[in-house]
């Protein structure tokens, strides 16, 4: 029975949820399914157990699982590979008399197959990894299914279980030397885990290994095995039916379903095992070496690729099987064409998640190379040993030294080449839980004969998986013959032949299986050999012999023999749907481990769920916490041993872990309750719906009967269910599980696993996804579509967005005319083979966003195809048959799931443009390097870690994009002579040495380069911003033709003059955000420089040589310390000059620059844009500014102007005078501004506005907010009225509290002068705090923003400032709610910023969000409660989700053609970012989406970030986007929007969602102001500057917001900005820092040494009397200066900035500096200690140069809990309290201090170590005294005057104590110390910030680990002598016992020891120490060697009765003798 559509009403409360749960359980339309997931899912869904007889015989073997094996399993942690029981396979038994032959298979293949393992020992057990999962899967499941076709019969056999056998001697040797342990399957899980961790090396394949077909021994072994038996044994080993070619029986196929394998199991397979390694290779027959009979010619896997798979989680190992008769088997027949076109079979052995869950996978036909195997003996050649080799572990000997590549040697006995490849360290990946995909099983496809016609004509079924399904199982076709079923199955598996079929067999030729992975070589054919010979050089790089060709064909990577590279991923024919929990192997970096989680919120639910577990894992060792300098080991053999700081490595680990955890979060289904019923809403074709209750295992075919009953459908016919996401619908397979699909889509939409997902299906979720129930009918076109089709031409066919399944019939008649075809956005589209073959002119094909998970097979038949676009799909592999598209020139595979490419790519000789961006490549797809005609490659947004050497073969490549990867090193590219552009942005590159001779454009933004040296002679543009670069130079050759150089956001402290001398052709130079104090004189050489930007540095002056830059047009110098112009600047022809935020004043009037400007100059005529905000200019500068006669834009905001009447500029269009001291505006002056469009006069002292402003007819922006306006608007003859300014778009009166707009009707003009509706263009009207007595105010609408509220909310003052920028529409909405929900302690502040708004009529969605959000939040708070913080956070989160649901519900209606108010079709690609601040009492909750940020500024100079930016380029956001099927291009999600979370964006769902990040803060007295702003503010201003401005205007948030806006515009912002400021406490007053000296309490100095300090409190006057004196010093500064002079210049500037900034905040006086040491005085102990603590914290958070953090004295150190306690420069501090002698320096006018007090303070500082604060006893006593006073105030409730004597002093101290308590402190008694130069010892106390208290423990441990003392040195000598005595006794020495125990020999007396130490230097002591240690090591080594060689240690004695004795007894006897001798001597 159908029901009407729901209205999507919300569930109200937990009680309602429980009722719905009960209804769901009771209303299930299907049978109750109480079976556990772990019991139900692993069973085959074919229901074949109900059938018997021939029906079972037609099917493949079905795998059954023991339900017990997983019934208690909830996560992967509980599944141990070694703890599994053997699993049997139930099958129909048909015994054969030949069964004993099959059982003898292991013994007959003993010499052939097990020899593979012997060979693997030579390659450091790497070949063992070639088995990959195969080895692992057979570890405990000793089974195989056998299907033999013998004598024309098709029979089935039971699985054969092979008994354990006793290993041979050779096998035993192999186990030892290959690193195998004797652990068996019965070992404990703990031992297995240790074994897993013990093997961490993955050896790449030796590319120069000779094929086994050349081995005479191989042929001999092959001949010894009878052909019949070999075929049967091969069937046993491979588990497939192998047919004799002479029988003539059609091949049949086993199609097991692919199952993801757990990574832990894979690692377990890596560990060599004595029983496992041999049996695995035996059971599965997988060739581990290139010398195997199946791997020599068309090897299914190379060593390197299998090694990669060994760490993967879901990859398929394939075996190419070819049947060649014994008479034709020879070493030459393997490559023959006849061998390639015999009847072929295929099998695909799949990895298993764990060893108890075998499953079958779909597979296609493949060929088998029948080259015999070789048996290679153990190599006895010497190898390189590591110094730390464990001699007791024989397996350790075979481990190759990673940096060493052992040269290949020839085995003369067998004629085979063996090589020991370079080792690559591959860390173990994270553990995973069991996914639903891993538990699902599929029935094997039925076997049938391959009929050629049906095979070529079969339909390719477009995969329906929206990357949301579990593993799919193939349903059993009904009513079809075996041949028909077989052919269809084969087509679904995309069988393609390696090349175009000949005429003879074009219809009857059976296409082979497409290449399943990058490592699977293509078929043998002449074209393949030719391309290999042509493109792949050998070791000499000049030719390629036949052996190299054969080796190349068996090696997917196609690398030359000299190449050793990290293996690429296997990409088998498996369905890795996104519900699989497995991860690709290459997700684990060869350099970076994947542990630690990122603080960024990729999925709050998962982070919260695992936070407890993460906290239990310490990052560093307990005994030694600091991290040494890390030497990166690149996969590329050219990678340098570059140093990287531990901080970066830890961050890499966090980023990598985030990726793994995020993928795990969405793909793990282990938390599902298999018995729980989930609600799902399914719609009918008439838009009615019904809600079903299903278990997770319920399939589509099980739901369809229930739906028929629900919808009362009695008609006959087939029905199906489609899934609609966005605008695309995909038909679900009968075996699909809708509940799992629904669940994952909900997670991708922002819901969490902890949410009630089981009842959410009751609601209308059609805005995200929609299940449609409909009959199976052909496509129906709308009239518009039919007209479009009829009108379309037949040459260029456009069939986009038509929901097609096949091309319309009409086009079949014109296929021969089609040249280009576009079928994009048709999710079910299939292009039949007939259509493709008949389109003989087809040149271009676009299949974008068809949501295919498989490569459309038939398109490889379009042999003339030139352009192919398949972006935005889920394609996991490219078939090898793509080689047939030899004419292909353009190939776009962007945004797929590719991990590798097939070897057939080498046939694409004409390929020129290749786009592989936004895929899953872990390793560079090296096969593309042999497409030598490539001109452009895009591999951005992958996870590539290194570039192989073979990249140099792309000699024609002009442009290469590798941005957003994980590259760490770029090596030599000198042979790529045509390379012009190289994009390497956003990688991890620390070193680059390309030597690219013709490279012109190089982009290196956001990498880790600290020193740039490269040879790029033709470089024209270099972008190297956001790198920790401290020096830059060019090796050997300088790029003289360079025109653009960008070095922004680096750490440069100077620019080498030689660099600028060589770059004489430079036109653009950017040096922003560095630490430059000057520019070199050589800048004058840049005579062609046009653009120069040195903003946000520390420049103290403009170099005079700058005046010689005659071509300079734009000069940006804002945010520096420049005080004056330079002579000669008047000769520059600048058009734009920005000197904002400098120290310019009136001094310019005194130099010649002013006089030269007065008489006319080039600058006065050329300058058009002059930005000079935030300086010290005043009215005396008007004559200078008037010289710029052509000035268009003048910005003089925040200067000292008080009168503009002297301004004579008439051509001005934009005038900014905000923040000055203007009180009036001259009418005559205004009349000169006839062209004025923008006038900013806010934050002045204006009382009235002249009437002449009405004459400014072009005025569009007028801001007079935050003034003191008080005038009568009706007096329009004398005061300004806006009636005549019709072009006004922005008008702001906010902040004028005395200004009144009163209704007044003028009879002269018969109009109301207060009417604001007369301004038709008005977009923003600010009337906050303005008195309104008129109704003539326009109503707010979608393109008009009105503010009329007061600037107080809940007693707290707030202010808003905004600007339209260059937009003509409203894009941001702010709203506040006072007394939210009627509660006095609640308020709500919201800021909604639009994205992708319509430029014509504004932004609709942001307005709707503003109007409805508060109501939604109220409902959610009522629903979830507000009793706890968690309840409120949940309500906030669901408020955004519900908001997004309602917004997209409206957009969904628009998309369906409904008429929705204020929304149009254009809004489907628009949305809004939101930041919500909810304050409840003292708790502040911040929730945000997108890039609007909120900052909490504190009065102690600190701040707290409350929000997180959701950008698509952030790795955690990017991973989520990719999992959901989206992509990122140019920093935008799907190329549309630059945020990853937002409300709206209907067309981007589920790639974008609305789950917010939420933070909670408990407000304290230190919290001063809240700043919420759109993203443009943070782009142009740093957070410190924002907080400084907010702190400066803490009492007036409206002025603070306005000043922030004005500064952003002065710094270059031209876009819209909205800023909201909230002062958190009522009656906040600006208070100065006080001292105990009354004279200094009220006075402040006003000199500014740095413009960054200008906004802070002025420096205090020097304190006198009792004061706190602090000395600071940098630890190891001399060493660092000598080691890194350039880096230390940058580091010292950072250090000084922190010191001086904190001094201003806490009120200290800088006495003087000596080098890097500071001497500082404070008037109170509390202020001094607070400053010390805060400086230590700031130093820890500073950005230090890479060189500083790469050494031990500056590296990152973490404590046991993982908290960083040291990083960067380490500063020691000493503080003392006393009364020094003040003395004023007459020259510097600085106060100095003298006397014993100063000396003692300096000595106390000398006691401290780096990071410590040493306090004298006097200071400690004074501090305790003040704290007792504070305790009396707090606990005793005494008044400040009673406690402190004076109230003002008490206020100061109490405020400082509050700051101190907000930081926290920890004191440790350091004991008494003798201070240098002082008589008495001083009791010293060490202080730390509270969060750094663990520093003390580290310092104590570090102190104990320092150099040994004298006593320890001589003790070591005693040990050495005693060990040598033992050696002498063992060797039969003649030294008597009494001589050996004499004190003079064994031990010096104290007198001798003192004499030695006094006579030697420190260097001699170190040499003595080294000598003693060497002696000890030698003795120990000799003793160990003797112990190993003999059964014991024999003491040689002179008497003949000496007996053999153990070494331990000998030692005991010797010690007893020594003791007895001592007793006798005493």
From Swiss-Prot:
Q: Where is the composition biased (Basic and acidic residues)?
A: 32-43, 93-102, 329-350
Q: Supply the EC number(s).
A: 4.6.1.1
Under the heading SUPFAM superfamilies, the entry gives:
L domain-like, Nucleotide cyclase, PP2C-like
Q: Which GO terms describe its biological process?
A: adenylate cyclase-modulating G protein-coupled receptor signaling pathway; cAMP biosynthetic process; positive regulation of Ras protein signal transduction; Ras protein signal transduction
Instruction: Supply one GO molecular-function term.
Output: adenylate cyclase activity
Can you supply one Gene Ontology CC term for this chain's record?
cytoplasm
Sites where N-acetylserine occurs are at 2
How is the cofactor bound, as the UniProt entry phrases it?
Binds 1 Mg(2+) ion per subunit.
- Please give the name of this protein: Adenylate cyclase
